[in-house]
Amino acid sequence: MISINFNFLKIKGIINMNINRPISPHLTIYKLQITNTLSIFHRITGGVLALTLCFFILILKMLNFHLSSYAFYSIAYTLNQYSGFLFIAISFFLLLFIFYHLFAGLRHLVWDAGYALEIENVYLTGYIMLGLAFLFTLIAWIIF
């Protein structure tokens, strides 16, 4: 029978308890940097865009099968009454998410090619990516 000694884990935990500090960085003392913040938002925008695509596919299926239904017309009429500001806000943020996700993906392709991997260039490409996402969003919003 194999015997494993886990006493070293207990000793390390006791030492950390004696000096009254957490074993790993806690969220209250951890400062967010642009690199991990942009990575988190890249994942969030990808999820939002995927869910939006699923929602629109579901709506198209409803249109295809239930176009003559009274319930569908009543829902469309109700949504039409409240569609002003809400529709504009949702469409603006979806456009921003599309451009943000596009430029973040291009940034990752540049990294995959082996360029801009120094920390200064990582920060610079992050700021450039943010600026391009907002700029292209505003340009597309003005044009369309």
Curated annotation (Swiss-Prot):
Heme binds at residue 101. It comes from the Eukaryota. Keywords: Electron transport, Heme, Iron, Membrane, Metal-binding, Mitochondrion, Mitochondrion inner membrane, Transmembrane, Transmembrane helix, Transport, Tricarboxylic acid cycle. Pathway: Carbohydrate metabolism; tricarboxylic acid cycle. One of its GO terms (biological process) is mitochondrial electron transport, succinate to ubiquinone. Its cofactor is heme. The heme is bound between the two transmembrane subunits. It is found in: Mitochondrion inner membrane. InterPro entries: SQR/QFR_C/D, Succ_DH_cyt_bsu_CS, Succ_DH_cytb556, SuccDH_FuR_B_TM-su. It is a multi-pass membrane protein. Pfam families: Sdh_cyt. GO terms for molecular function: electron transfer activity; metal ion binding. One of its GO terms (cellular component) is mitochondrial inner membrane. The chain crosses the membrane at residues 40-60, 84-104, 124-144. NCBIfam families: succ_dehyd_cytB. Belongs to the cytochrome b560 family. PANTHER family: SUCCINATE DEHYDROGENASE CYTOCHROME B560 SUBUNIT, SUCCINATE DEHYDROGENASE CYTOCHROME B560 SUBUNIT, MITOCHONDRIAL. Membrane-anchoring subunit of succinate dehydrogenase (SDH) that is involved in complex II of the mitochondrial electron transport chain and is responsible for transferring electrons from succinate to ubiquinone (coenzyme Q). Forms part of complex II containing four subunits: a 70 kDa flavoprotein (FP), a 27 kDa iron-sulfur protein (IP), a cytochrome B and a membrane-anchoring protein. This is Succinate dehydrogenase cytochrome b560 subunit. It comes from Reclinomonas americana.
